[in-house]
């Protein structure tokens, strides 16, 4: 079986990487206004991929790259059919400063599509945390050698790499199941969100440790990726709850949480 992206998907992924890197570099003014450049997304065709005979798998690829760049716009809400609404007469305190939060209408529930989308974005966040950790481990010198030569550092990066690749496989599987309306869509999406969002949080925590002191400060962008990862993990059903859902589906009985 061929699990590689096809030519169109690879071109779309590369286009997203290039566009996002130019619009949302790591050294951007994080504290200033965050322009979602929605009109540019429309020009790129990302707001209506169906017009190009593409589907949710391609949207998931875009979300992965948006997670990597910490894109500030509501693309996830757009592709999952979620509606942003303001709470009446209240203030919503945000944790992830790169993404304002909104209240969901009463009765809103996570769909497999939403879970798969969040998993895809989490993969991008985890990959960026890993890449930042690798870059620092290669260039930061300690006792005359790059810190990446020490097992305490290199093994953390190796573990993160394994987690990211597993998360990506689950996210792509979930995206395909949702796109094809496969009977395993609910199970795949639950598994993907549980593993990928947790992997993103752990990837950020490990990368912060690899960076040492600077990783714990607001001077470095890592804390923003960490907050996005925590947001993805904590929105809706958490990994522990998703595991109960998965066990229920596998065993056909209600599992005690």
Where are the model-predicted features located?
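Alpha-helical interface subdomain recognition
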Residues: 1-69, 115-257
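Glycine-rich, Trp-frequent "lid" loop and neighboring beta-strands that shape
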Residues: 52, 61, 68-109
